[in-house]
């Protein structure tokens, strides 16, 4: 840039010097002409010699030749197509002047069409020629990056969104925690509702078991031979059944509650029936033991005590303390008849108590007889009855022995006013 300025300044000074010289030359010729005219006017009447000398003096002043103008030099520039045109000199003949425009320059002979190159600005590379390069950004003194609030707005929006997300998460956790105790209480309430059913069923089964034991005890007492009975019933080794025993095979005592399944306590369906079948098998296996018991001396002692008590009762009857004509007592119909009991349970036939076809001796007043110790048939029959009674008692002392590990029944003690009291 400095070189260009120096070049322009040199050209300008050269041009200025040339013009000054030309002006001086012109001014010198005018002065000489004026002087010559004055001389001619003032000395018109002089002689020819004097005029000749004056003319020679003037001609001698015009003798030096005029200088030719210096040729111009056109500077290099960028044309309208963006191409660089190198500088050139106008020194060919009369074409000594740089003419044209800033974008197109040439040499000419007319001085009036001369181009003032100092006014042109296409000496540098144009901005549009730098393709792919953004223009240099000028620093704006009014722009302060510290006062720009665009980034701050973005930060504020992101912070608000993050806070809303956190609030939603904590709200959800709080609601779940608030509803969780209610669900726990509901589950506990359901558990409490379902558990008493299991306990009630267990208590009810224990109560049914106690009732069954009591009823069996009463049935055993009813099935025993009375004191004045001459013909006794045949006892079976099987445990007498009762209507309550059929209900014990079901895990639920009530039909409506039996449909509800207990998720906490589930009982196997055939457990009670299997226990009852095993109990019957144990009862069937007691027959051999009863035969061995009858042959023992302890059984003889029991029979002797029995005969002594029978003799004492006969004496009381003779004295009139006991009624000689016993009244027949009608037995209440039982809810469950052993003769029509279940045919099979767990593949075993149930044994029932069969009543003898002939009527009892005490039912008829004509057949009533006092005690005769010499009657061998009565003694033999009483001995058989006592043996069978021992068998029945041994089979019915613990009818549900296998169930006592879960529900131990209490063995009641019945107090009577009879002297033939037997504790079971």
Swiss-Prot record:
GO terms for molecular function: PDZ domain binding. The chain crosses the membrane at residues 150-170. Disruption phenotype: Induces an increase in the paired-pulse ratio of AMPA currents in lateral and medial perforant path-granule cell synapses. GO terms for cellular component: AMPA glutamate receptor complex; dendritic spine membrane; glutamatergic synapse; ionotropic glutamate receptor complex; postsynaptic density membrane; synapse. Residues 24-149 are extracellular. Keywords: Cell membrane, Cell projection, Glycoprotein, Membrane, Postsynaptic cell membrane, Signal, Synapse, Transmembrane, Transmembrane helix. Residues 362-373, 402-424 have a biased composition (Polar residues). Residues 171-424 are cytoplasmic. Pfam families: Shisa_N. InterPro entries: Shisa, Shisa_N. Residues 1-23 form the signal peptide. Residues 333-373, 389-424 are annotated as: Disordered. GO terms for biological process: regulation of short-term neuronal synaptic plasticity. It is a single-pass type I membrane protein. Glycans are attached at residues 45, 89, 116. It is found in: Cell projection, Dendritic spine membrane; Synapse. Brain-specific. Mainly expressed in neurons, including in hippocampus, cerebral cortex, striatum, thalamus, olfactory bulb and cerebellum. Expressed in most brain structures during embryonic and postnatal development. Component of some AMPA receptors (ionotropic glutamate receptors) complex, at least composed of some AMPA receptor (GRIA1, GRIA2 and/or GRIA3), CACNG2 and SHISA9, as well as low level of DLG4. Regulator of short-term neuronal synaptic plasticity in the dentate gyrus. Associates with AMPA receptors (ionotropic glutamate receptors) in synaptic spines and promotes AMPA receptor desensitization at excitatory synapses. Belongs to the shisa family. SHISA9 subfamily. The extracellular domain contains a pattern of cysteine similar to the snail conotoxin Con-ikot-ikot (AC P0CB20), a toxin known to disrupt AMPA receptors (ionotropic glutamate receptor) desensitization. This is Protein shisa-9. The gene is Shisa9.
């Amino acid at each position: 840039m400095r070189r260009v300025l120096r070049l322009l300044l040199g050209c300008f000074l050269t041009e200025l010097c040339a013009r000054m010289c030309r002006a001086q030359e012109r001014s010198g010729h005018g002065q000489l002409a004026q002087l010559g005219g004055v001389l001619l006017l003032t000395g018109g009447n002089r002689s020819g010699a004097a005029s000749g000398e004056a003319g020679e003096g003037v001609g001698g002043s015009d003798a030096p030749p005029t200088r030719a103008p210096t040729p111009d030099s056109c500077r290099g520039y960028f044309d309208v197509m963006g191409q660089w045109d190198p500088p050139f000199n106008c020194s060919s003949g009369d074409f000594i002047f740089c003419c044209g425009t800033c974008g197109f320059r040439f040499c000419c002979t007319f001085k009036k069409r001369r181009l003032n190159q100092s006014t042109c600005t296409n000496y540098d590379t144009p901005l549009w020629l730098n393709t792919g390069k953004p223009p240099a950004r000028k620093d704006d003194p009014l722009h302060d990056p510290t006062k720009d609030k665009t980034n701050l707005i973005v930060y504020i929006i992101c912070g608000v969104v993050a806070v809303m997300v956190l609030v939603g998460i904590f709200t959800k956790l709080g609601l779940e925690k608030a509803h969780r105790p209610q669900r726990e209480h509901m589950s506990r309430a359901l558990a409490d509702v379902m558990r008493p059913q299991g306990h009630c069923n267990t208590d009810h089964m224990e109560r049914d078991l106690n009732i069954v034991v009591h009823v069996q005890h009463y049935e055993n007492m009813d099935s025993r031979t009375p004191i004045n009975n001459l013909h006794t019933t045949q006892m079976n080794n099987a445990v007498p059944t009762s209507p309550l025993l059929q209900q014990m095979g079901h895990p639920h005592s009530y039909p409506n509650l039996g449909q509800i399944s207990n998720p906490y306590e589930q009982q196997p369906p055939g457990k009670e029936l299997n226990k009852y079948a095993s109990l019957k098998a144990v009862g069937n296996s007691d027959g051999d033991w009863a035969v061995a018991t009858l042959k023992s001396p302890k059984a003889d002692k029991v029979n002797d005590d029995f005969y002594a008590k029978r003799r004492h009762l006969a004496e009381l009857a003779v004295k009139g303390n006991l009624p000689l004509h016993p009244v027949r007592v009608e037995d209440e119909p039982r809810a469950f008849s052993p003769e029509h009991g279940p045919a099979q349970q767990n593949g075993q036939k149930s044994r029932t108590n069969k009543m003898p076809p002939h009527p009892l001796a005490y039912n008829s007043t004509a057949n009533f007889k006092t005690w005769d110790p010499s009657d061998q048939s009565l003694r033999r029959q009483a001995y058989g009855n006592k043996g069978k009674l021992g068998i029945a008692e041994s089979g019915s002392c613990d009818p549900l022995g296998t169930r006592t590990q879960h529900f131990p029944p209490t063995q009641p003690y019945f107090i009577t006013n009879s002297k033939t009291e037997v504790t079971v």
